[in-house]
């Protein structure tokens, strides 16, 4: 079994996915993982794993690891409707990235001003078994997590 640490892409309060106010994430429809409620300031969202940028949108990105793990970072909820406002990308789709590398600058105050939730779900795409995700202690306690700290570990058979 391989284990991949998945880093917090932004600082803030670590949350279990069940507390994300969107059933697509809270019910594990796209996969399992955890989330971060960021501070109300502009932050750089980093790559939570090393790999290739498989998909890059202004408000979300998917990184595929060498082991075939697809990790989605979604900056805020319902932010697709902002057409990129509040987000500045620093990489291109297809780029190789290293865990900890800045991917998108996220203007959290702009998202809040638009009346949207700034919560950042981080999920292993297509993971159907929550037992394969081991959340970090910050997630279980709802405490603050630093950017780049381990948010959860993805275990793959």
What positions do the PLM features span?
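Contiguous, well-folded functional domains in the mature portion of proteins
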Residues: 1-157
